[in-house]
Regions:
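Long, contiguous binding/interaction regions
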Residues: 1-122
């Protein structure tokens, strides 16, 4: 039975996990796909521009993306996002630990239902 399109929103969390941490006033976001078959999708969807748009209310700097193909992962560096860093910021999350989870709620533009893509052996 096919789900109605309105009920289905594919998010980054459906294909990957993330870990984040601070480096002064910068944050590193490591994003790793669950299945190496989704690495190309990760590269298409998680661009520097889309990440900057996702964090537009709190990121005053830039986003740099580093590809790690052997790990099926990317590392994102967001600058000027922690209001001066953990020792100066009055933010609730001065180390940016919640930003990885925040990124995972980003909707993917590719809204094809992964359940409709059968993989042999699964």
């Amino acid at each position: 039975m096919k789900r109605p399109q309105a009920d289905f929103v594919r998010r980054l969390a459906d294909i990957a996990w993330a870990h984040s941490g601070d480096k002064g006033d910068m944050v590193n976001l490591g994003v790793v796909v669950h299945d190496e078959a989704d690495y190309a999708l990760l590269l298409r969807e998680v661009t520097e521009q889309r990440v900057l748009e996702h964090f537009k209310d709190i990121c005053r700097g830039e986003v740099r993306r580093y590809e790690l193909p052997n790990l099926h992962a990317i590392n994102l560096v967001l600058t000027q996002i922690l209001d001066g860093g953990p020792m100066r910021s009055l933010r609730l999350d001065p180390q940016g630990k919640t930003l990885g989870d925040s990124l995972l709620i980003m909707a993917l533009e590719d809204q094809s239902d992964p359940a409709s893509k059968s993989t042999p052996g699964r």
